[in-house]
Curated annotation (Swiss-Prot):
Disulfide bonds: none annotated. The keyword Nucleus applies. Residues 18-31 have a biased composition (Basic residues). Residues 34-44 have a biased composition (Low complexity). Residues 18-57, 153-193 are annotated as: Disordered. One of its GO terms (molecular function) is DNA binding. Keywords: Developmental protein, DNA-binding, Gap protein, Metal-binding, Nucleus, Repeat, Zinc, Zinc-finger. The gene is hb. Gap class segmentation protein that controls development of head structures. GO terms for cellular component: nucleus. Residues 174-193 have a biased composition (Basic and acidic residues). Belongs to the hunchback C2H2-type zinc-finger protein family. This is Protein hunchback.
Length: 193
């Protein structure tokens, strides 16, 4: 279920444009390297390239899902605030994975350096808060803004959720409630501030 939500997230976000656009570049280069044998291929490749990205989207999603599941285990310990912020970056794993696959090498590098902490929990966010991902995205942006104000509140809240996300694999509802609570508190803080 979260895969479709995740796909929807990617499609909602401008990242999908990057994904298609840059993959078009990538396949163009790929065809360029083949241009020795297929001279016409580079010229045609931008046209068929929209099809490969759709496949690539699926592959990427599967790849991302694996990443999520692996990193979920590692990143459950991450602070929920990071997870919330990462939910805003939900599409960015696609950038990250694209980079690890050798595409977009220039683009995600600054992103990775800017948000290395967020990039990693972000798969956690997509799995744990996928249902809340769409609302959380805005809330996460709010959380980012309110993060400084929430700093005082954040540590105690951080202490409990790392345990509850660990449960997220068994019962996704709990972390969602956690994150919804976090989201609401973030929103309230924003409005109160």
């Amino acid at each position: 279920w979260y895969s479709s939500m995740f796909a929807a997230n990617i499609k909602q976000e401008p990242i999908s444009h990057h994904l298609h656009h840059h993959h078009a570049h990538h396949s163009h280069h790929r065809h360029d390297s083949n241009s020795n044998s297929n001279a016409s291929s580079p010229h045609q490749s931008p046209l068929p390239s929209p099809n490969p990205p759709s496949n690539t989207n699926l592959q990427l999603e599967q790849y991302l899902k694996q990443q999520q599941q692996q990193q979920q285990l590692q990143q459950q310990q991450q602070q929920p605030m990071d997870t919330l912020c990462a939910a805003a970056m939900t599409p960015s794993p696609s950038n990250n994975d694209q980079n690890s696959l050798g595409w977009l090498s220039g683009l995600p590098n600054p992103m990775q350096t800017i948000m290395p902490a967020n990039m990693r929990p972000s798969p956690t966010a997509t799995t744990a808060t996928a249902a809340a991902a769409a609302p959380t995205t805005t809330v996460a942006a709010i959380a980012l803004q309110a993060n400084d104000k929430l700093q005082a509140l954040t540590p105690p809240m951080d202490v409990t959720p790392p345990k509850s996300p660990a449960k997220s694999q068994q019962s996704c509802a709990e972390p969602e409630k956690e994150h919804d609570l976090m989201s609401n508190s973030s929103e309230d803080m924003k409005y109160m501030a």
